[in-house]
Amino acid sequence: MPRPPQDSGRTGISLAGKTEKRLVLNVARVAAIRILNGIMTDQKQLSEMVQTEDFKALAPEDRARTQRLATHTLRHVGRADRALRPHLTKLPAVEVLNILRLGVVEVVGLGAPAHAVVNDLVSICSSTGQTRPYKGLINAVLRKAVADVSGKWDKSPVQMMPKWLRNPLREAYGNGTVMAMETAHMRGAPVDLTVSADPQEWAEKLSGTVLPNGSVRLNDMGQISVLPGFEDGKWWVQDAAASWPASWLALQAGETVLDVCAAPGGKTMQMALSGAVVTSLDISSKRMERVAENLSRTKLEADLVVANVLDWQDDRQFDAVLLDAPCSATGTIRRHPDLPFAKDGTGITELIGLQAEMLAAAARRVKPGGRLVFCTCSLIPDEGEVHAENFLNAQKDFVVDTSVPEGMQAEWRSDEGGYRLRPDYWGELGGMDGFYIIRMNRAS
């Protein structure tokens, strides 16, 4: 994708990725539609698509706007479809439907001028043979849908999770709770920071808010890498919920700790900051490079090991072990709204089996008298509470830790002794990622 002029945000590219004829199009809209198509048709994840050379070639401001358009559209697909349905005799191809969805969301949801958006999307539709026959439909349907839904948008039902996820969550939590989660997903996620020093001081410097657990939540995100303290490594981005597993270990200086599935390194940095002797384990050498970069920026130290905990050839045991197991990541939808569209629920059974194996392997690394924290960023009980129950029934030398981590609310505790965190918690503060966390102590 050619780099657009930085003063206009427009370029002569086509939706198909090559110029068919010289059209002046809004590059962010073109790129956002490509992303939506990749997610909806090929089940690609947003994190994958923003690593392409086409996306990286965009100017920084266009990359930011592209992601804003794509993520906002993904959060409001249901609302957009409700607005469009009365004006469509039948659903068009998804590539056409995504142009319509983006148009409705940008005009009604983001407040962009209808005339400019519709005209540009008609031009985008005309730029490739696949969608060109639908330019008249795009023009007519968008104008009608935008006019009809204006003033009703905020009253429209929020985006529902797909059945493969919604059904088990409704069974576990009830429909009211699931609807509260969906509302939290629609609102998106602020940026949370874990800071290396006084949270209040950094909250003031960054115009943020100190959360009950000590994280700093930014009120105005902007470009993260240009904020004070980033280059100096004084803080790192980490959702508040994701900071609890490491802090619950309550590490002391000099203690040994193993961080299993360590990338991208937020928990490793928390542990290193405590003065513990940290060994970070991850199966991916590429992801471990990210951990090394983060440690270098923050001037913290850890021993990085690329290996699978299931067959790691090392007989050491540790004072503490943290396993953040690979999972469905369904607790992160508020910041990754592509997940309900990019995933279809397949593979979760295999993940659950892997999690059980990894939990048993991690437990073998805990010294007598040590402690183990197990967590997943999943909303599905089979990836959290069920594992804890099964493990505690089988491993009689481990018992649930009854302490309450800083900022955690007692009512979040689940029956087996862990904590079930949900995206609708702290709603007045902006929510949190969904997580399951349990600490278990090994007998001496």
Which residues fall in each region the model found?
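S-adenosylmethionine
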Residues: 1-444
